[in-house]
Amino acid sequence: MSGRDNRGAGGGGGGHQPLSSAMGKLKEKLTRAGDDQGYHRVESNLSTSNTATSLDTILPEDPFLFPQAAPQRHPLPRPQQQQQQQRQQLRLLEDEPPLSFRPLLEDDDINEPPTQPFQQQQQRTPLRASGSLELTPLPPPPTSQEIREHRDRQQRSVPVPVEDLQRSKQSLKGSRVSFEKNNASSKPPAQAESSDEDSFEDKRIGFQQQKATSVDHKGILKDLKHILANDNRRQFQAKKHVSLDVKGTRFLQDLLKESSSEEEFHKTRREFQGRKHQSLDPRVTFKLDKVLQGSSTDSDEEGDDPEHKRLIHRPKDITKPLIIDLKDLESESDEDFHTSRQHFQQQRSISTDSRKSRRPYEMDEMGNKRGENIRHAVPFVRQITEDGKPKLEVYRPTTNPIYIWTQVLAALSVSLGSLVVGFVSAYTSPALVSMTNRNMTSFEVTPQAASWVGGIMPLAGLAGGIAGGPFIEYLGRRNTILATAIPFIVSSLLIACAVNVAMVLAGRFLAGFCVGIASLSLPVYLGETVQPEVRGTLGLLPTAFGNIGILLCFVAGTYMDWSMLAFLGAALPVPFLILMFLIPETPRWFVSRGREEKARKALSWLRGKEADVEPELKGLMRSQADADRQATQNKMMELLKRNNLKPLSISLGLMFFQQLSGINAVIFYTVSIFKDAGSTIDGNLCTIIVGIVNFMATFIATLLIDRAGRKILLYVSNIAMIITLFVLGGFFYCKSHGQDVSQLGWLPLSCFVIYILGFSLGFGPIPWLMMGEILPSKIRGSAASVATAFNWSCTFVVTKTFQDMIDFMGAHGAFWLFGSICFIGLFFVILYVPETQGKTLEDIERKMMGRVRRMSSVANMKPLAFNM
């Protein structure tokens, strides 16, 4: 028998009492002993078949401070032995020190036994009373020296067997355990009378250690029941990791269900821990896709297999479900993983104070002085939204100097292409005058043939606009532009050397096809190469050079016949061709084709050799990944969806009223119109004046469009065109009916100047501008291609039928028809066209469609591929 049992036996001197007396006083003494000496009461509602259950799972908080021996199992006492055992229990109750119990908590590991104490564990015999009460005496607390030695031994992790503890845990399933707090149990009576200071300090330490067991009994009981409900507590501890970040890791439930074995579960959990960093800050990590791609060696070989992808669904996240290729996130070694994790932490630090930046600054494509200063001062953060909830996309601040000369060279090269386009478009206006003169040509050009010479170019432009989309996608922006230079030269030479109308028509068709391709590829190249800080200034160059080309054609046509004018047109693409060889392909196209190194070289050329292009390159890669995820196979079916039809219809309506205002008919036939009007001013001089007005009006519109608003300028443009067209119609009506209009020779020129000025202020640039503003981002590229093709179709109809309309209804009828269409267009603008001045793209789309999508950048606009 242990020393504890000897003390109990020596302390009880009551002798043998009758059985009835002992049984009668059992309950009273048990209650008094528990109240006076601080016992904890443990009740059990176990069934009779489980009466051998012990309470060994209720352990002391520290196995050294409260040493206990392995539980001893005894069957139920036979009736003839109960009297003697009850007497012994009564003697022990009077002499034993108070008890203390602690339940098995969640942090305890039953497979990792407590450390062996410095002294031999004492044997303990559980005290039983009426088969439902078990009490264990509490030994005296250790001294400070013993505690220090014990903690040193714990660090060496010397295990002891705990097989009985495991069996006891299993036996407590379904049991009900309650605790009663009694602070008196914290101090044994034998130790309370000591006056020695060291003994008092030891007792105080022991009291503090025991006190922890009485904290929040309800919570302890709840945790105890939760632990007892698990067959494998180690597995419970492993699965507990998934609750560390419930919002970001709820998707792991599906992975845990798929685990058929514990080994598979641990493997899945290790993979999850390696990727768990992505859920730390969902506002940023959805943009950090493929952060660990560099540490994977299998991703390139296995490709984008859908079986290796998982859908991360965050119910309370601000992002849409995001597809991440898990193989791109795998890491071959811990070193690679830690390197990637450090990179992630550096990027994540940008959003640590997002609450103070709920209204970050956004710089639109044209830019402004205030936005430029802000971007130089603080990190440029663009706020974009998805389904009405804010989301942040982080860009680095522009700290590198802007190398203007390289970007000016790129913009100048592209703008020379616009000059060629403007010259080709205006060619028929001065050329048809000399071409229809039998004294200046070797072949006859009938009025019907002349209408085809002017109208075939827009028809070919329609075909070129459709073909330009796949060309810039697969050949590249720069290569596509280069491919148009040689056909421009060939087309002009065909016209210059023509011996019949067929050669002229062939040259015009080839030139029109190149115009359609260039009208789509030139602005795309410029938008993808120029920095936002100078995009507003350099973005004006193509429009200005296009008007210069028109003016040059009008001026040269005054002194040259149609053949010499065509030779001049053949010479213009030569400098354009040479300069295009000096500039690189756009970095964004290289990224879209997976050529990262070439994209880096192109950025270095455009931004400067000493510029840090890595942040911008990574931003391009993230934008391309976004565009690829949003891309759909059938673009045309997407256009026909109900939510997309309204903005597309408005864009097509603006294009329709732009061309049906008769602008191209006026430009193409300016000289003929002034000649028929009998103006006292030379027709060629009038044409030059119209070209100058068109050139100057472009700069006026640039100053007013962001101040007066889109709709105001459209109103002014419509009213100006309506008045001038009806006045011109009245002038030609009076002239055709024999009235004397010689005193009004100045009127046609005045009307043409006002008409061109009004058109250039509103219906000239605004339909193209609003096409990029009101079209939804998801269909912006394909819808823009459709709108461009529709614009060229209307141009062809107007230019081809203008001469027929004059022959059928007279010049006055044609101008009145155009004026009536402009009048209808005024009501179209009032009723259907929204005002977009000062509004973000998200606000515009919310108004148009009733919801918000994340706005893609201009470079994400993909041309229509016509995947029917």
Swiss-Prot record:
Compositional bias of kind Low complexity: 44-57, 79-91, 117-126
Region of interest called Disordered, as start-end residue ranges on this chain: 1-213, 257-314, 335-367
Alphabetical list of InterPro entries matching this protein: MFS_dom, MFS_ERD6/Tret1-like, MFS_sugar_transport-like, MFS_trans_sf, MFS_Trehalose_Transporter, Sugar/inositol_transpt, Sugar_transporter_CS
Cross-referenced PROSITE patterns: MFS, SUGAR_TRANSPORT_1, SUGAR_TRANSPORT_2
Gene Ontology biological process terms in this record: trehalose transport
Regions of compositional bias (Basic and acidic residues) in chain numbering: 25-43, 146-155, 257-290, 353-367
Chain positions found as Phosphoserine: S259, S260, S261, S331, S333, S856, S857
Localization annotation: Cell membrane
Gene3D superfamilies: MFS general substrate transporter like domains (1.20.1250.20)
Swiss-Prot/TrEMBL keywords: Cell membrane, Glycoprotein, Membrane, Phosphoprotein, Sugar transport, Transmembrane, Transmembrane helix, Transport
One GO CC term on file: plasma membrane
Stretches in topological domain Cytoplasmic: 1-403, 473-484, 530-535, 585-653, 706-711, 773-778, 834-868
Residue intervals annotated with topology Extracellular: 425-451, 506-508, 557-563, 675-684, 733-751, 800-812
Major localization listed first in the record, in broad terms: membrane
Transmembrane domains' residue ranges: 404-424, 452-472, 485-505, 509-529, 536-556, 564-584, 654-674, 685-705, 712-732, 752-772, 779-799, 813-833
Sample GO molecular function, one term: sugar transmembrane transporter activity
Topology of the protein relative to the lipid bilayer: Multi-pass membrane protein
Glycosylation sites: N439
Compositionally biased residues, Polar residues: 342-352
PANTHER family referenced in this protein's UniProt entry, alphabetically: FACILITATED TREHALOSE TRANSPORTER TRET1-1-RELATED, PTHR48021
Role description: Low-capacity facilitative transporter for trehalose. Does not transport maltose, sucrose or lactose. Mediates the bidirectional transfer of trehalose. Responsible for the transport of trehalose synthesized in the fat body and the incorporation of trehalose into other tissues that require a carbon source, thereby regulating trehalose levels in the hemolymph.
Family: Belongs to the major facilitator superfamily. Sugar transporter (TC 2.A.1.1) family. Trehalose transporter subfamily.
Protein name, as recorded: Facilitated trehalose transporter Tret1
Native source organism of the sequence: Drosophila pseudoobscura pseudoobscura
